[in-house]
Amino acid sequence: MTPPRKLHIKSYGCQMNVYDAQRMVDTLGAEGFVETAEAGDADLVILNTCHIREKASEKVYSELGRLRVAKEEAARQGRAMQIAVAGCVAQAEGAEIVTRAPTVDVVVGPQSYHHLPELLARAGRGEPAIETEFPAEDKFGFLARPSREAIRARGVSAFVTVQEGCDKFCTFCVVPYTRGSEMSRPVARILDEVTRLTENGVREITLIGQNVNAYHGEAPDGSTWTLGRLLYGIAEIPGVARIRYSTSHPNDVDDSLIAAHRDLASVMPFVHLPVQSGSDRILGLMNRKHGASDYRKVVDRFRAARPDIAFSSDFIVGFPGETEEDFRATLALIAQIGYAAAYSFKYSPRPGTPAADMQEMVSATEMDERLERLQSLIDSQQAAFNKAAIGTVVDVLFERAARKPGQLVGRTAYLQPAHVMAPDNIIGQVLPVRIDSLERYSLLGELVATAAPVAGAATPLVSIGG
């Protein structure tokens, strides 16, 4: 019997890359591959790359240097190792990757993962195996479905891609060039995927897309569903305890999405809503097509519909031309909104984007200083948000065993990790926890009540405490 070939995938960047990596594993599993945690043991290594920031791209080439050594060692052992570069760096740089790193066998963009078996066969015959086109067919219709065993092994939370690409063309962003124009998956395929996940133990669904709330998918009756309408449809599927979505653009928040937050307890009151800057002038240079006041109005609409809602965001400091006054406007917006969490970055020029050609670059020293000030404000807000949980009872979805024996870790509605001493038969349940203290960014508490263990793949979740 021929032993299975071993596959190692290393993903960089966004949640969609995590999802894409899982789908590549599923597709290659049908070709006889099994995963291995060690790149050096693999017959195929895939780097699933991110192109959002310069450092992410350079990390890929550093990793390829290490893999070249591993590939040479495998050859000395009489074993052939193939190396593939996938993701947004592959899409952006294409054949240049092979020129710069000849050890690479396959280069495949995000829209062509269903062609991986064919590309690997081509590379095995010594033929060029580079595909970075945007094929006409929908890759999701060709990628293999995960096995029941794979779903169960991945845990109680799962990502589901509903939308890809972006038509916003923010001047700093490469996504429209690496992921293409906006494309929404058909409603039926999404509902089928979610149903299969919940039938195999998944309790939390996170819908993902580069601009997820631009979703406009075709329903079986020919109508078009928005993201808000899709949330209602998913909420009706037995076993779905929690629904999240990411990442959103303020301009695409419509009434149906607000209504879903108002009406559906399963839609979590935590929204990642990037704004990037609080300066109208900088937002204009970024081509965000909204101002700071527009963003505040969107936040107000969410809060009016769901008073317990909280927000996270993205911020870029040091965008070309950013003055101290512009930066202070960002700090003012952060102070006005009050965030549960946020991600802050120094501006990194990406080749081919309009911002890369802008003048008036902010110095590295100023960027560092501004990032420190911004992050300090964000950290203080996050600490206050977490501290406010002490003494309250919060619902926690228990996900897995923690490092400490006898302890489980789960997530609150706001994605805060919560650690509780509890039996592992409650994994997959949402249970009330009284929060007693904090440990760095984690909440510590004790169960208020217990419930019957989830007994079987399709058993609906037992939820206590609303």
Swiss-Prot record:
InterPro entries, A to Z: Elp3/MiaA/NifB-like_rSAM, Methylthiotransferase, Methylthiotransferase_CS, Methylthiotransferase_N, Methylthiotransferase_N_sf, MiaB_methiolase, rSAM, rSAM_horseshoe
Gene3D superfamilies: Methylthiotransferase, N-terminal domain (3.40.50.12160), tm_1862 like domain (3.80.30.20)
Pfam families per UniProt: Radical_SAM, TRAM, UPF0004
Cellular localisation: Cytoplasm
Single GO MF annotation: N6-isopentenyladenosine methylthiotransferase activity
Cofactor list: [4Fe-4S] cluster
Catalytic reaction equation(s): N(6)-dimethylallyladenosine(37) in tRNA + (sulfur carrier)-SH + AH2 + 2 S-adenosyl-L-methionine = 2-methylsulfanyl-N(6)-dimethylallyladenosine(37) in tRNA + (sulfur carrier)-H + 5'-deoxyadenosine + L-methionine + A + S-adenosyl-L-homocysteine + 2 H(+)
Catalytic EC class: transferase
GO cellular component, one term: cytosol
Domain Radical SAM core: 152-384
EC numbers: 2.8.4.3
Co-factor binding details: Binds 2 [4Fe-4S] clusters. One cluster is coordinated with 3 cysteines and an exchangeable S-adenosyl-L-methionine.
Record-listed [4Fe-4S] cluster 1 binding positions: 14, 50, 88
MTTase N-terminal domain sequence ranges: 5-125
Function statement: Catalyzes the methylthiolation of N6-(dimethylallyl)adenosine (i(6)A), leading to the formation of 2-methylthio-N6-(dimethylallyl)adenosine (ms(2)i(6)A) at position 37 in tRNAs that read codons beginning with uridine.
Official protein name in the record: tRNA-2-methylthio-N(6)-dimethylallyladenosine synthase
Organism, scientific name: Bradyrhizobium sp. (strain BTAi1 / ATCC BAA-1182)
